[in-house]
Amino acid sequence: AFLGFDAVSTAAQETKNPKRNMPIGILVSLLVCTVLYMVFAHVMTGVAHYTAFSGQQGIAPVAIAIEHMGQADAAGIIQPDYPWLNRAIVLSILFGYCSVIMVTLLGQSRVFLSMSHDGLLPPFFSHINEKFRTPARSNLLFMVLVGLLAAFVPARLAGEMTSIGTLMAFTLVCAAVLVVRRTMPDVPRSFKTPLVPLIPILGILTCLCMMLFLPADTWIRLVLWMLIGLDIYVGYGMKHSKLEHGGDTRHGQVALNMIGLILAVLCVITGLWHQQTVGWGENKVLLIISFVFAFTHCAYYMWRIWRK
């Protein structure tokens, strides 16, 4: 529900007086979304019992709520009073998705633009179109990738991956607040997170608690995705980064290798957890993939440690 409010920060370079306007935009958007979603949830659970929405995906909960706005026939089946309203709301939701996708793509292309400027990604992602003054190549690439994912990835899988990825990002942001506040206490800040370290710690615990309710196969994909990201950084970003903070120091290399080993161990743990959940006699594709990734990366980062 709250996915996307952080996309406001990606447009900081294109904002007038970002020190003042960015915190206002983020906090106001959070407040408005919180109120709207509370009202929406109240209406939905008022129309139908909350157990009726269990296990539903995508826009199905809205359709279920509308179907409950009717009278039961002789067979006990509810006949909707407003069947046309179901189709109208579904259509409006699809139109709403267009604006959400546009904002998400805008934010993602700006993130990759900044990473490319630092050297963490190839120059392809920092190319600016001379006519539109936007990262057009990145926008086109993400448009194709998102279209393929939307066409071929099940809604449940996409939703769970989005949820766990977003919660993981929020967890890292909260941890970064703790680290930066301690390591760079004298940096000028136009906006400071109040009640540090209480607020970041509560944020980390809340995100981790919500992540625990996601299925084990989602955790496997999260760890695999993080390993792939670490591979990109080790193979390209660390060598081309203009900041060069940590990559060339002994402590930075040790921390990098330890993160790789920890992720490899987590890959094994999540694979076993998933197989225990579905049963040892069921499909073992994810278990095999997790073990291959784990042992490959464990061997590689052990070799890096031995080489140093």
Show the residue positions of the predicted features.
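Alpha-helical transmembrane segments
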Residues: G25, L85-S92, C98, S138, D231-K239, V268-L272, F295-W306, ...
